[in-house]
Amino acid sequence: MNSSLGILWQACPGGARILRVFGDSPCPALPVQIEGFPVVEIGPYCFAQNQRSQPADARFWSVDGRGPAAYPHPIAGDFVQGVTLPAGVRALHNAAFYNCRKLEWLCAGSALESVGSDLFTNCRALDRFILDAAPDAPTGLKKLVAAVSADIGAVFAPGGAVQAKVFYPEYFEFLDENTPAHIFNHSIEGEGYRYRQCFDGSVLRFAEYDAAFPQACVGESEKTLCRIALDRLCIPYALLPEAQGIYSAYLAAHAASAAAPLIARRDTESLQLVLKLA
């Protein structure tokens, strides 16, 4: 938790709901509890630049005990780059990160159960969710990736130790009108939707995720497929031999495409894996 952080909050069923965050850090780590109440919810438009009026029962609290005058700057909008939620957060309300265009990552625990609508609208820089949970634990990942149709990665890192990585490609949804009958046909383009269904309840099913790769090879780009294969091979959590062979064969056949982004970001560990397969 940041040592200099101001919080506008209200009581809610089970604990505290954070309504607004103030401070100077673009990557705040929110408090586990406020005045003895466990933090369990993030309120609507909490990190949005333009916020709605606050409820009458809203209260101010700060880590260092100073009042609201010491915290004039909201951590909101384009200022936000990453947010670490307390492990006990169960709900993210509507548009909590609305128009946070520079938000790159969100870290959440295993308690997340509910997410609102328009949660990440216009969060164009968002590229990963970090789960402070074991890869085989129930988490809110299914709901989080369902809220983002663009490319998005997920990292399981309980206690900060990375145990698994997966990548969810972009997908698109369309409604096509059959004009004479006034019937709308729902269609989906991209394998990202299929990947987002690979859960048993709220637990990621790695075998099902890996089984989607051959179909993804039909329509996804080399860049996307290399990312999927690399994430699974570099940290092969619950990776079955058959899937490992398929991923390895793909990277061996597309080594140049796989290596290019790794060289650009100087990811030597992943690059060595690709070179061994080539």
What positions do the PLM features span?
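Structural signature of tandem-repeat unit edges
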Residues: 2-15, 22-40, 52-91, 101-114, ...
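Conserved hydrophobic site in ankyrin repeats
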Residues: 274-277
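Glycine-rich, acidic and aromatic/proline-enriched surface loops and short helix-turn segments
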Residues: 45, 51
